[in-house]
Structures are given as structure tokens and as C-alpha cells.
Amino acid sequence: MLHIDELTFENEVLQSEKLVLVDFWAPWCGPCRMIGPILEEIAKEFNLKVVQVNTDENPNLATFYGIRSIPTLMLFKKGQRVDTVIGAVPKSILIHTINKYL
């Protein structure tokens, strides 16, 4: 899973030809750490890019995308945000959401 920041977000997410799942998280967030292994599995199982944005280190991105609670997972397709999942949800819910856009 790739860790990105404000400098690499446009290239890695907005200009990506692949579907991108962005995990807005922070290292002190228990639910964020809990969902991490699930995201690793999804990155291996699906034809999409999974990236993480540390909200503590990238507050401008968090503000721009209206992040109010973490983890917040956003799906981007061809540079456009197409879906958002808030919280440490079960893998089955993430899979259902991802499958809508593949």
C-alpha cells in the first residue's frame, strides 16, 4: 500500500487510470489500524490502487475533502470521487462498494 501526501496526490490519485481507494487515516487511530490489514488484502485481490493519506501530516487534503472522522475511505475513478465509506467497516461492505465501480 502506497503512502502519499499533498505533493503526490494528484499524480497517484487524480491522474490514475485505475480505480483508486484512498484511506484517510492517522497512526493514533485504533479503527484505522484495525482496517489496515483488510486494505492490504483488497489491494492484492482487486485491480485497483490502494493508497493512504496521513491526515495529521496532510491537513490541507483532509480539509479539502471534508474529512471529519477517520478512517474515511474514498474511491476515485478517472480523477473523480465516486464513493465514500466512513469508519472501520467489514471487508464485505468494502468489496460491495468497490465492485460497483470496477
Curated annotation (Swiss-Prot):
The record marks 23 as: Deprotonates C-terminal active site Cys. It comes from the Eukaryota. InterPro entries: Thioredoxin (IPR005746), Thioredoxin-like_sf (IPR036249), Thioredoxin_CS (IPR017937), Thioredoxin_domain (IPR013766). GO terms for cellular component: chloroplast. Disulfide bonds join 29-32. Residues 2-102 form the Thioredoxin domain. Pfam families: Thioredoxin. The active site is at 29 (nucleophile), 32 (nucleophile). It is found in: Plastid, Chloroplast. Keywords: Chloroplast, Disulfide bond, Electron transport, Plastid, Redox-active center, Transport. One of its GO terms (molecular function) is protein-disulfide reductase activity. The record marks 30-31 as: Contributes to redox potential value. PANTHER family: GEO12009P1. Belongs to the thioredoxin family. Participates in various redox reactions through the reversible oxidation of its active center dithiol to a disulfide and catalyzes dithiol-disulfide exchange reactions. This is Thioredoxin. It comes from Cyanidioschyzon merolae (strain NIES-3377 / 10D) (Unicellular red alga). The gene is trxA.
